[in-house]
Structure formats: structure tokens, C-alpha cells
Amino acid sequence: MSVLKRLESTHGRFFNRHDINSKKTSGVKWKNVLASKEKGGLRVSSLYALNRGLMFKWVWRFYTQNNSLWAKVIKAIHGDDGKVGKKTKSVFPSIWIDIVHEMESLKNQDIDILKCMKFKIGNGEHTSFWDEVWRGDITFKNLYPRLYALESCKDIVVASKLAHPCLDHSFRRAPRSGVEQEQFIALINQVQSVSLVPCRDRRVWSLEGSGEFSVASVRKLIDDKMLPEVSSKTRWVKAIPIKVNVHPWKVRLDYLPTRFNISRRGMDINFISCPICDNGVESTSHLFFSCQIVKDIVRKIVRWCDFSFMELSSYEEWVVWLSNLRLSSKLKSVLEKVFYVMWWHIWSFRNKKIFGSKNTHMATIFEDVVSRSFYWCRFRCKASFSWIDWLKNPLLVSL
């Protein structure tokens, strides 16, 4: 686990562009980055979930490749069930038992990966009627405990059980009235539509439509259970680079190291005023929405796109404004790309101005937004519009 934590730490430092020995504070909680986009994160996915997915791949193989040499060795040492799903202690070091323990640990956190393995019944000759999950989401021995207590052949297979016209043929006595009779009727109703076919029973993975196991599905299951709900669903535009998509995500959640955010964390800085306009505190909302110079750039963009300008003071207001525009979803996507590129260039200009870079001219930002957004929309979308068409109005191009 300590190795995994170090790897996660390195992963986080790389994301925040921190040196491995750096003591800089991070404005972004790593768990929020790992969370899925549906939960407001970036869906980087945790190494913890990946590691468990790779572990469980061996459990899947243990069941689906049970005639392989390694599976036979596991059965010879730990029994036919391999101790999977059981609480067990090992008196000697065992990688297999460590994997079993991890599955049990996840189950204690309400993540029962074994439940995702289902039986697809063929001839029913290799599936336990009571011990396997082959009908519904729970074993019959747990769903109908009173009937299981009456069963004289606990390891009876589905084919043998359904071969007789009545399900109580292998019971030591007939079910009596009350709970036993209620469970017996429910069992009959649950299996009466089952039809056996002349093919071998096989295990299927319920998290994939193909029925085949995938590490990615386990990874997603664990992350969805263990990672936090950050905010509303993350907006993502496929036509622009990842780094440009991440930037608006930081704008929305106020994760950027603006002067106001830095001072709020207790760090002493000489100025907290906006480095672009020198008028007002440099907060995220001011830098990208309230700054007068940024507003001038936005006015140029709305004139270019041929619609009216509206005063906005936050990311949330911008989302509402965009959603209320009477444009098709494709054109809204184009406009969203343009704004994402604009915010990216504003942040880049701000950093160059603070850290003394030369050739920082505010007048070039609009030109950079037009050219860069054209390049990404034209070539990353594989569209066919021309540079001249884009210059006239990006909302009139054909994607």
C-alpha cells in the first residue's frame, strides 16, 4: 500500500507540475481529479482501483480457466473454491490469499466484485443450483434459506434439479405451510421460465455488454463507489486538447492559483490586484469575467460571432447564458470551444505578464483565439470549412 501511495503522490505532482521534492501546496484535491466526469471530476482514475482490477483478473481466470495448470495448483493448496469469498487466514505468505483478502476488504466497503460474475446457463450440468448466482442477483441458498435447509443434496446442479417435474424431489420432506410454502412458491415462479440448451454453462461479466471481463469496468466500479461527488457533470469538448479542457474545469471549481487564492491559503504576496487591469482583486471570477480588458475581448468575440453581448460575472452565469442561446448543439459546441481557447490564452497572457516574459501584448489575444480555435476545430474535427469562412463567422461554418 505504501508503494501505491507513493505512486499516487507522484501522479498528483505530475498533474500539478510540481517537482518530486517540491513542498508547494496544491490547489486541487487529487481525489477530485480522479473522480469521474459524471461526478464533476476529470476521470483520471486511481491506481488503487487499477491495481484491484488487475488482481481480480486472476480471480476471473481462476473460474474461467479452471482446467489450467496454475488453477489446479491453487485448488490443490487452497481447496476447490480457492477460498474465494471466504474469510481466511494464511499461516504462510501467499499472493493468492492476499488477492482473496483484498476482495474481502472491498466487500466490507460495499463493493462486492464477485456479484458481477454471473452464470449463463446452457445445459445446467456445471452450475450449482444453490451455491451459484445463476438466476437473479443472489444465490438461492441465501434467498431461500428455509428451502436450502430442507435440501438433502446441497451440491445439486441445475440440470439435475430441473430434470424432475417438482423441485422438492430432493428435499428430505415436503415444504410445510407458512414461510416454507411461500419460499417454495417464489422459487417455482423464479425458475419456471428457465430453458436448458445443449451448450456448456459459462460465466459472464455483468459490467460489460459482451460478457467478457475487463479491468476498466472494475476500475470504474471501485472509483464510482470510493471517489467523492465533486460537483455537476464536467463539461468536455473533444475537439480541443486535454490541457485546454482542464483549464475551464479549474475555472469552474476555483482551483487556479490566482493571487486571491494564494493569499487565502496564508501565503504572503505583495499584491493581490489583477495583473491585467490593475483594478480589483485577482480572483477567478474577476480574471475571466469581470476584468474590463477581458470584457473587451469578449465583446470582439460576440461581434465576430454576430450576437449580442451580455455581462457575465461567473462561470455558472456563462453556462446558463450558453444553454439559453437559440443555437443548435453543434454551434453551441463551436462557441464553447472559442471561449475555452480564450480563457486559456488569458491565463497564458497573465502568467507571462507576472513572470516578466517579453512580447506580452493584450491586443494579440483575440487574434490568437481566432487562429488557434480555427486550427483545432478544422483539423481535430476533420471538418472542411475554410479559413476565410471561419474569419467571417465561426457559427456559419459547416462541421
State each model region's role.
Residues 1-399:
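A helix-boundary/hinge signal
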